[in-house]
């Protein structure tokens, strides 16, 4: 059994059947609101890609994708996606989207090397979204404006759920707070990055941490990011304080994507310049792909947060070891 936290005296606010109904209602409302607020069109998404395309998300660079071959095309090494971070940018180009327009997908992924706990599963379901911007819009104001729009969807969703289920109380603050990862380190120099996240979220309730992937003044990173989609100076994580855990919980990771210059710079820093030869990276360096902003929003995380669940397995069906299943059952945590 991996790390498991049992909230003292936990009792679910909804039954199993009520939970399933609420999940559908919540997802439908959030999806519609997000699409309207960001001007997004839903598109079909791949479950797997060819390794040689360079389209899979390498995450932190050490996670192993699930891979397989197929009888019809034995020459291909096919990978289950980790996310669609790079695929979406290519799709905007292929589908001929215009400036100010975007797309979103229902993304399903398998992350086989995930460490299992209350909020982590090997099954990942999220809304992956991407939107075209101008090069001149690659700045912090564009990032913040987009974060505020997304936070508006979170606020509207909380209102919707509380109206449906009055015994669930509101906990989100009126506004989102912005802070850079360096400001956060300066504020809490003796804490780890995760401890900093909880400290700042306990103070403000909802926080967007700007600038993730590059090294801070201490020489450490706030967190890892793949070098070939987010610009590490124009990205961030959206976190909420979750009273049930007395911790910060990340609901979304997003950012303005790399341009030609930042891609080359970050590939060099990450010591993986060989990726420049992959088809996706070649298109980007040749100026064939649009400038974009995009991210992923965890569907199960959102359901868990708004329905006040103690374990992500209460809102999604996945794989858990017998010790975790038994311990959860003994503590009123009913895994699907």
UniProtKB/Swiss-Prot annotation:
GO BP field: L-asparagine biosynthetic process
Keyword annotations from UniProtKB, A to Z: Amino-acid biosynthesis, Asparagine biosynthesis, ATP-binding, Cytoplasm, Ligase, Nucleotide-binding
Cellular compartment(s): Cytoplasm
Keyword Protein biosynthesis set for record: no
Reaction equation(s) it catalyzes: L-aspartate + NH4(+) + ATP = L-asparagine + AMP + diphosphate + H(+)
InterPro entries in alphabetical order: aa-tRNA-synth_II (IPR006195), aa-tRNA-synth_II/BPL/LPL (IPR045864), AsnA (IPR004618)
Pathway(s) per entry: Amino-acid biosynthesis; L-asparagine biosynthesis; L-asparagine from L-aspartate (ammonia route): step 1/1
Cysteine-cysteine disulfides: none
Family statement drawn from the similarity comment of this UniProt entry: Belongs to the class-II aminoacyl-tRNA synthetase family. AsnA subfamily.
Protein name: Aspartate--ammonia ligase
Organism, scientific name: Clostridium perfringens (strain ATCC 13124 / DSM 756 / JCM 1290 / NCIMB 6125 / NCTC 8237 / Type A)
Gene: asnA
